[in-house]
Amino acid sequence: MAKLSLIEREKKRAKLVAKYAEKRAALEAIVADQSKSEEERYEARLKLQQLPRNANPTRQRNRCSITGRPRGTFRKFGLARNKLREIAFKGEIPGLTKASW
């Protein structure tokens, strides 16, 4: 199991990303807009750099919601592969069955 501090750090990052999502999207749109003047685009770029580093969604890491494991996490379920397997075999995930052909 991952340290609780790592799990809490990821939760904090998720909150920051949600908080600054609109502002970041607006600034990125200005930077990408070719009809704006170079000065406006430059100002938007500077404002983007002023946002907190952890407000960038690329800094987020998908973690298992049970164990906090950072690797082998299925996005659809939010679980690591081993926990997904355990829960699936117990039949606790509706519609999920082991493949057989």
UniProtKB/Swiss-Prot annotation:
Gene3D superfamilies per UniProt: 1.10.287.1480
This protein's record includes keyword Cell inner membrane: no
Gene expressing this chain: rpsN
Assigned keywords, A-Z: Ribonucleoprotein, Ribosomal protein, RNA-binding, rRNA-binding
Protein's UniProt name: Small ribosomal subunit protein uS14
Family: Belongs to the universal ribosomal protein uS14 family.
Oligomeric and partner information: Part of the 30S ribosomal subunit. Contacts proteins S3 and S10.
GO function terms (MF aspect): rRNA binding; structural constituent of ribosome
Taxonomic superkingdom: Bacteria
GO cellular component, one term: cytoplasm
Pfam families per the UniProt record, alphabetical: Ribosomal_S14
